[in-house]
Amino acid sequence: MRQKETTATTRFSLLPGSITRFFLLLIIVLLVTMGVMVQSAVNAWLKDKSYQIVDITHAIQKRVDNWRYVTWQIYDNIAATTSPSSGEGLQETRLKQDVYYLEKPRRKTEALIFGSHDNSTLEMTQRMSTYLDTLWGAENVPWSMYYLNGQDNSLVLISTLPLKDLTSGFKESTVSDIVDSRRAEMLQQANALDERESFSNMRRLAWQNGHYFTLRTTFNQPGHLATVVAFDLPINDLIPPGMPLGSNH
């Protein structure tokens, strides 16, 4: 009888330890399983993000190639074209000192000319604006082009933004700051003999929450200052929803 009691006592004393070891093993298995699942999820997320980055890179490169071609088209064909009757009926409005607005039927773009210029620059601005009306007709994000004219050192700004309203309204200083900044960049590049093409860092148009970068191209002209053509190329439409962007200005 005493031996049976001793055996039963030993069995019950070992039972709690067995349960503890079982649960410890179960917890370890669960942790390992969760770790594998988390690692698999992280790897899938990283793979998806890497594919997105590759797609964005290809899209940006395609955009650069397209607008590099447009830059040459504008300089070689649009800006250089002359027509005896192209300037008939053209009008410009002086918004303030050395800032002129090209009057044209309201289409996709508006144009400003900064600095003294002659009628040939006005005609050239009208041709470039009409050309960009076609290219930007279906676009919903802001696009802008700057043309630093080596012939008279004027600066032409053509944009899908409402330039006349912005220049006359409370954002006047912002537009002036952007134009002054672009002119300084373009003049610097025009004087850099070894730099034909350059890119800016990513920028942000604050009131539109639009991110973009600037493509600048220099064209040297014997006997004149260099002409520089710059495009602000938006990237918001190339970025997947939910992907954060920097806050550069």
Please provide the spans of the model-predicted regions:
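Well-ordered, non-membrane alpha-helical segments in soluble/globular domains
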Residues: D118-L132, R183-A184
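Residue-level detector of secondary-structure boundary/capping sites
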Residues: A44, K62-D65, E123, D177, ...
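Second-shell loop/turn segments in exported
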Residues: G115-N119, S173-S176
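Short N-terminal helix-loop-first-beta-strand/juxtamembrane motif that initiates sensory/input modules
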Residues: Y69-P105, T134-V156, T160, E195-F199, ...
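Extracytoplasmic/periplasmic ligand-binding sensor regions of membrane-associated signaling proteins
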Residues: A138-F231
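Solvent-exposed, extracytoplasmic
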Residues: T125-E139, P222-H249
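Juxtamembrane extracytoplasmic/periplasmic/luminal helical "stalk" adjacent to the first N-terminal
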Residues: L15-G115
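Non-catalytic regulatory/interaction regions at protein termini and inter-domain linkers
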Residues: M1-S13
